[in-house]
Amino acid sequence: MEVGIDIVSLERIEVLYSRYGVRFLEKILLPEEVALCLQKPQIVASVAGRFAAKEAIVKALGSGFAQGVHWKSFAILNDAAGRPYVKVIDDECLPPSSVVKLSISHDRHSAVAVAIIE
């Protein structure tokens, strides 16, 4: 079992989103994720949560964004109950038998995510 955690400032994401708009989202998120974020009333918090989740996952992997792992290797989506889950796009970044558990939270200032890979 491996664990990763990340925290990101909502202000940091707000600055990037204000400066680059949807181009910023498209750089770090897959189209399905972008669509989900743009539907949320708090777009920046939704983007920040996914950003933190992806960072937490690569920390749990131990590779960071290297060795073929990149922002779009996996998507952070939500099930019918709103719980986050990982949709693996690039099978080489995670072994097929891996189970990834995620927890994402945010307040007015930051978003945090914890990833557990079993």
From Swiss-Prot:
It is found in: Cytoplasm. The keyword Magnesium applies. Its cofactor is Mg(2+). It holds the Pfam family ACPS. One of its GO terms (molecular function) is magnesium ion binding. Keywords: Cytoplasm, Fatty acid biosynthesis, Fatty acid metabolism, Lipid biosynthesis, Lipid metabolism, Magnesium, Metal-binding, Transferase. It comes from the Bacteria. One of its GO terms (biological process) is fatty acid biosynthetic process. The keyword Metal-binding applies. Its EC number is 2.7.8.7. One of its GO terms (cellular component) is cytoplasm. InterPro entries: 4-PPantetheinyl_Trfase_dom, 4-PPantetheinyl_Trfase_dom_sf, ACPS, Ppantetheine-prot_Trfase_dom. It catalyses: apo-[ACP] + CoA = holo-[ACP] + adenosine 3',5'-bisphosphate + H(+). Mg(2+) binds at D6, E55. Belongs to the P-Pant transferase superfamily. AcpS family. Transfers the 4'-phosphopantetheine moiety from coenzyme A to a Ser of acyl-carrier-protein. This is Holo-[acyl-carrier-protein] synthase. It comes from Chlorobium chlorochromatii (strain CaD3).
